[in-house]
């Protein structure tokens, strides 16, 4: 019997049969009997196919877990860009735009930054930038006169500039480094000059003979001879002039000529309200050239009210004019009848305490006055009055642009 048992053991070893299976088939030399569950586990453990199945099950569980952990780590280390910063702080961006009297939309904000401003070919990156040079290049395209401009994009580029010039705490680390100051050219070293030779008689420079004056030598004449080479000397202020008979008033032409000589023309600064020292706003009125260019390069209000309304909207947003500047702008770009219609439509939109248009005359006169108010733009209250006034003026322009149908013209066509 022992020989049979040893033969069975050798056969079981050669064919990969475990001792547990030998016990199940009745081999007495296989040792003590075990339970069915212990036998099944031992068979699964020693079988190569069973080990492979267990490995695949463990791997199918671990691989998704590791993939999820790696993805979370990579997403946590995503590089922030100016565009992503503004989207993460969108509530602050909208509040900044609202304080300037404009509204911005998140979807259009992304479209302009990633597509339209990039296609302007002015160096604007898809991820956005807080560089004032890039913002200025985009502004030139947006504020281009006539059909080449983009008035609908004015609120967005204005908000970008506001974030760059007055950055909040989350923008400051992403501002471009300031440009190094341009070094001043070093003065050239003086070249050694030849020794001076003395002469008994100095050599006088040749002078051209004086030109005869075009105008008669009348000292009391207010006109100035513009053909002479040198301007006449102007008396300095050495004290009060002696009392005596007053000289006749100079003509307007002579006055303008003298003012041009005495006060050279300065460069035009078409920014009525600008920040000065200590963040205090300074006043710069419109120049005549600005008003002339706006009027000559745009159609009249009666011909294309939408285009002129968009122009005035961009001026109101970027220049932030005072009450006087708004009247000057309306007088330059609109006729008398058009101004009356715009002011009437604007006064209809004055909000009351409940936010709806009111009909109380005192509230209307206080919010949208027809006479010059006492609003100080250097104070927050004055700037708030001006902001609401500009919004109502823009609403009046849009209301006046909806002209009623001329029934006489319709009858002629029929």
Curated annotation (Swiss-Prot):
Query: What is the annotated localization of this protein?
Result: Host cell membrane
**UniProt GO BP:** virion assembly
Name the residue ranges with Pro residues bias.
Answer: 174-193, 210-220
Provide GO CC annotations from the record.
host cell plasma membrane; membrane
Cytoplasmic topological domain: 1-51
Low complexity: which segments have biased composition? 194-206
Where does the record place the region Disordered?
Answer: 171-282
Membrane-traversing stretches: 52-72
Q: What is this protein called?
A: Glyco-Gag protein
What taxonomic ancestry is recorded?
A: Viruses, Riboviria, Pararnavirae, Artverviricota, Revtraviricetes
């Amino acid at each position: 019997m022992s020989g049979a048992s040893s033969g069975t053991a050798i056969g079981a070893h050669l064919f990969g049969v475990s001792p547990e299976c030998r016990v199940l088939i009745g081999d007495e030399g296989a040792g003590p009997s075990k339970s069915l569950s212990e036998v099944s586990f031992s068979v699964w453990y020693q079988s190569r196919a069973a080990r492979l199945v267990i490995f695949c099950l463990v791997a199918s569980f671990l691989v998704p877990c590791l993939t999820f952990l790696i993805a979370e780590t990579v997403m946590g280390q995503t590089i922030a860009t100016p565009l992503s910063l503004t989207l993460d702080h969108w509530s602050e961006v909208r509040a900044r735009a609202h304080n300037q009297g404009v509204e911005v939309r998140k979807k259009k904000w992304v479209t302009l930054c990633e597509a339209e401003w990039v296609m302007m070919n002015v160096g604007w990156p898809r991820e956005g930038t807080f560089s004032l040079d890039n913002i200025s290049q985009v502004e030139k395209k947006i504020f281009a006169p006539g059909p080449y401009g983009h008035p609908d994009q004015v609120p967005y580029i204005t908000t970008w500039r506001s974030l760059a010039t007055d950055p909040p705490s989350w923008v400051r680390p992403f501002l471009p480094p300031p440009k190094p100051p341009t070094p001043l050219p070093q003065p050239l070293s003086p070249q050694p000059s030849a020794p001076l030779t003395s002469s008994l008689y100095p050599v006088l420079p040749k002078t051209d003979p004086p030109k005869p004056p075009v105008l008669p030598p009348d000292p009391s004449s207010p006109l100035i001879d513009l053909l002479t080479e040198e301007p006449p000397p102007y008396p300095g202020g050495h004290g009060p002039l002696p009392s005596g008979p007053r000289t006749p008033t100079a003509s307007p032409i002579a006055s303008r000529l003298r003012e041009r000589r005495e006060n050279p023309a300065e460069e035009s600064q078409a920014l009525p309200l600008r920040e000065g020292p200590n963040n205090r706003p300074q006043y710069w009125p419109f120049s005549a050239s600005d008003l002339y260019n706006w009027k000559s390069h745009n159609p009249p209000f009666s011909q294309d009210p939408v285009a002129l309304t968009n122009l005035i909207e961009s001026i109101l947003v970027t220049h932030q004019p005072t009450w006087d500047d708004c009247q000057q702008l309306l007088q330059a770009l609109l006729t008398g009848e058009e101004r009356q219609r715009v002011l009437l439509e604007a006064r209809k939109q004055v909000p009351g305490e409940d936010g709806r248009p009111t009909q109380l005359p005192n509230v209307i006169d206080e919010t949208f006055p027809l006479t010059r108010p006492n609003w100080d733009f250097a104070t927050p209250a004055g700037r708030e009055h001006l902001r609401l006034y500009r919004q109502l003026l823009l609403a009046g322009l849009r209301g006046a642009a909806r002209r009623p149908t001329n029934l006489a013209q319709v009858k002629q066509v029929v």
